Amino acid sequence: MIFDKVLSTINKHNLIQKGDKIVLGLSGGPDSVCLLHVLNRLKKDFNIEIYAAHLNHQIRGIEAQKDALYVSKLCEDMGIIFFVKSINVPKYCENEGLSLEEGARKLRYEMFYEIKDKIKANKIAIGHNLNDQAETVMMRIMRGTGLKGLKGIDYIRDNCIIRPILDVERNEIEEYCEAYNLNPRIDKTNLENIYTRNKIRLDLLPYMKDNFNSNVIESIVRMSNSLKSDNDYIEKEAEAKFREVSNIKEKGFVEINLDDFVCLHDAIKVRVLRNSIKHILGDTNFVDQRHIEDIMSLEDNSKVNKMLTLPRNIFVYRKKDSIILTNEEIVNEEIEFYYNVPSNGFIKIKELKQIIETQVMSIDRYKSMKLDNSSKGFDFNKVKGGIVIRSRRQGDKIKLAMGSKKVKDLFIDLKIPREERCKIPIITDSEGIICVGDYKISENYKIDENTKEVLKINFNKL
């Protein structure tokens, strides 16, 4: 019965092709032992090579050593090449700040990929079953998840990780092992309700089965499978939109154009953000729905220059026209400069890669000129002492129509990104600020009906 069911799953989801080289995660428990036995029976039909990999987590002492001996003997009897590795998982988790579940899973998969690369295999087979599927969906519901989380465990992931017994129930697996006298090892920690998954397996699902629906496992999985095709379609659309709205400059950096992003449906937005994080980290582990919602809140124009920090050192910055996601904090390095400016001539500001050009002329000539936004004019007779162009300083103020305003507050009002503020030149005379770049002119130096001479300043990029 199981053999036919597994073969059907393999064919339906195209999990194995002739000539595949497969690394099988072998814990010694019923699931992985059943999977090994079934694939070994299929070995000749598919012309596949099977290699087994076992990790001793150094958690269960002598029992863990017995597990390793058991799987070693099992592989020897079947003629399967066997790899074993021993790692102090508790110590690793303590150093990395991970739970035992998270750390053990991470180390197992690292070992699987290491062996896969070493022997040039192309598949990794994992013994997840139907009950695991239901437990995973329930865990994600309680943690908070979207449609992608509800679709549960994939039959195949990254064109590499396959789960051939995902349609098989745990009790069927146990019966199979008994029928073939496989005598798998039983991890007693799986019988202790100290982990979230164990509590779902041992307490929640049995309670639901006894009090609500005797077929609750099948119902959860059926729901999960029905959502999968919907999710797959949306994911495909989201991937295309991600490419359209994102500027991917380098590994670890994604900039999302807000004009395009805000027009998307929320279902697509969520996936665009997840794709952004996946581009940076390689996956979206430990980034859940609330983190995605926090990023989406940055659409609001009142959030310009806000910054978020997500798990695994993802930094999110709201710029004027974009949202930036990166794995490196953007450090604002202050640029300092100070130059005396001639009344007529030009000066090169190498720190800004700009040329500042100055010219004194009559008011009539000034009014006859066609000026663009890069030019500013001031009443030359109101200028006191020499003209200086410099970087901003703490406490800088400029006189505006409504009174004096701190330059820092002016930058905030103008929504100038924090890292750009140090690049805006401040032009002063001996009495105060004449203008802040080409953004604002002080009321004290503006042209009026009494102006006879104008100081024209041009801000030109090199």
Curated annotation (Swiss-Prot):
Pfam families associated with the record: ATP_bind_3 (PF01171), TilS_C (PF11734)
GO terms of biological process kind: tRNA modification
Known catalytic reactions: cytidine(34) in tRNA(Ile2) + L-lysine + ATP = lysidine(34) in tRNA(Ile2) + AMP + diphosphate + H(+)
Highest classification ranks of the organism: Bacteria, Bacillati, Bacillota, Clostridia, Peptostreptococcales
Its biological purpose: Ligates lysine onto the cytidine present at position 34 of the AUA codon-specific tRNA(Ile) that contains the anticodon CAU, in an ATP-dependent manner. Cytidine is converted to lysidine, thus changing the amino acid specificity of the tRNA from methionine to isoleucine.
InterPro entries found in the cross-reference section: Lysidine-tRNA-synth_C (IPR012796), Phe-tRNA_synthase-like_B3/B4 (IPR020825), Rossmann-like_a/b/a_fold (IPR014729), TilS/TtcA_N (IPR011063), tRNA_Ile_lys_synt (IPR012094), tRNA_Ile_lys_synt_N (IPR012795)
Gene3D superfamilies hit by this protein: 1.20.59.20, HUPs (3.40.50.620), Phenylalanyl-trna Synthetase, Chain B, domain 3 (3.50.40.10)
Signal sequence interval, chain numbering: none
Positions that bind ATP: 27-32
Record-given protein name: tRNA(Ile)-lysidine synthase
Annotated source species: Clostridioides difficile (strain 630) (Peptoclostridium difficile)
GO molecular function: ATP binding; tRNA(Ile)-lysidine synthase activity
Gene coding for it: tilS
Compartment(s): Cytoplasm
GO CC aspect terms: cytoplasm
Main localization (coarse): cytoplasm
Written domain comment of the UniProt record: The N-terminal region contains the highly conserved SGGXDS motif, predicted to be a P-loop motif involved in ATP binding.
The family this protein is said to belong to: Belongs to the tRNA(Ile)-lysidine synthase family.
Keywords: ATP-binding, Cytoplasm, Ligase, Nucleotide-binding, tRNA processing
Entry EC no(s): 6.3.4.19
